[in-house]
UniProtKB/Swiss-Prot annotation:
SUPFAM superfamilies: Family A G protein-coupled receptor-like (SSF81321)
Site (Plays an important role in the conformation switch to the active conformation): 110
UniProt-recorded name of the protein: Rhodopsin
Superkingdom, taxonomy of origin: Eukaryota
Residues with PTM N6-(retinylidene)lysine: 293
Major localization listed first in the record, in broad terms: membrane
Originating organism: Myripristis violacea
Function: Photoreceptor required for image-forming vision at low light intensity. While most salt water fish species use retinal as chromophore, most freshwater fish use 3-dehydroretinal, or a mixture of retinal and 3-dehydroretinal. Light-induced isomerization of 11-cis to all-trans retinal triggers a conformational change that activates signaling via G-proteins. Subsequent receptor phosphorylation mediates displacement of the bound G-protein alpha subunit by arrestin and terminates signaling.
């Protein structure tokens, strides 16, 4: 059922469909489902906010973390905070009411904030992959990665994020309630007259999913080849072989994290776009959105907390200036000292 600035994925033959801006949507799912949605958003906030805020705080506290290669990690933390503050808090409030109680303006603001945070996070992973490839594989022999390059990378993420999220505010597509009608996103559902949804969805799918996917696979594929070649040249070195295994495991983890975050959402959005008019349950789009929003937790875990340098500084900050695991961390780093330069450049952080 399509109405002004909303789309409900069910027929209104019985006359029960109501505007998600004005009435609870309990006819879509049981009221308990909205409580589960609110609880899940609360879970993302209480875990996502501290770990991302701590990343920024620890970087301010420890000068050695303020290196050009870490700029993009800080940007990733900012993007996740944008999602947490601008998107998740709103969804908790609306799920308590069972509909998008904040109206059309609130839908635009929530859809813009959550999508912008997600897009900046996505492009941060792309820039991170490019930076690791450039530093480790050295495709440009005389190139030296510096602060200006790091700032350019961060700027690119915001430009691409805004290039994705601003058009729906000015008439190229639009933000509408989606899933259980308690949060807003891009209109993949309709071909509403005057919004050119078809061209926008194609642009979104190609420029903000396929291209990032290809770039990430290419960069990490080349990086793995470079690490394996280095390990093959030093077959006698146990530390090099261990470093290769660590890097391989980390790259696989990073790629899986990206796919878990964006593949379900992009696939379902594309299916809905190509099967417009067909009926589907409200959970059909809600569940993939859960995966995308969960990135505010597992992105910092993969890319920041698994970074030895960040982890040591975080523990030092949390334990008031002393890292209780310092001896273990030191022993671990000593074992891989011979390959520390390459592994630190490769690891997600």
């Amino acid at each position: 059922t399509e109405g002004p600035y909303f789309y409900i994925p069910m027929s209104n033959a019985t006359g029960i469909v109501r505007s998600p801006y004005e009435y609870p949507q309990y006819y879509l799912v049981y009221p308990a489902a909205y409580a589960v949605l609110g609880a899940y958003m609360f879970f993302l906030i209480i875990f996502g906010f501290p770990v991302n805020f701590l990343t920024l705080y620890v970087t301010i506290e420890h000068k050695k973390l303020r290196t050009p290669l870490n700029y993009i990690l800080l940007n990733l933390a900012v993007a996740d905070l944008f999602m947490v503050i601008g998107g998740f808090t709103t969804t908790i409030y609306t799920s308590m009411h069972g509909y998008f109680v904040l109206g059309r303006l609130g839908c635009n603001l929530e859809g813009f904030s959550a999508t912008l945070g997600g897009m900046i996070g996505l492009w941060s992973l792309v820039v991170l992959a490019i930076e690791r490839w450039v530093v480790v594989c050295k495709p440009m022999s005389n190139f030296r990665f510096g602060e200006n390059h790091a700032i350019m990378g961060v700027t690119l993420t915001w430009v691409m994020g805004l290039a994705c999220t601003v058009p729906p505010l000015v008439g190229w597509s639009r933000y509408i309630p989606e899933g259980m009608q308690c949060s807003c996103g891009i209109d993949y559902y309709t071909r509403a007259e005057g919004f050119n949804n078809d061209s926008y969805v194609l642009y979104m799918f190609v420029c903000h999913f396929l291209i990032p996917l290809v770039v990430i696979f290419f960069c990490y594929g080349r990086l793995l080849c470079a690490v394996k070649e280095a390990a093959a040249a030093q077959q006698e070195s146990e530390t090099t072989q261990r470093a290769e295994r660590e890097v391989t495991r980390m790259v696989i983890l990073m790629v899986i994290g990206f796919l878990v975050c964006w593949l379900p959402y992009a696939s379902v959005a594309w299916y809905i776009f190509t099967h417009q008019g067909s009926e589907f349950g409200p959970l059909f789009m809600t569940i993939p959105a859960f995966f995308a929003k969960s990135s505010s937790i597992y992105n910092p875990v993969i890319y920041i907390c698994m970074n030895k340098q960040f982890r040591q500084c975080m523990l030092t900050t949390l334990f008031c200036g002393k890292n209780p695991f310092e001896e273990e961390e030191g022993a671990s780093s000593t074992k891989t000292e011979a390959s520390s330069a390459s592994s630190s450049s490769v690891s997600p952080a």
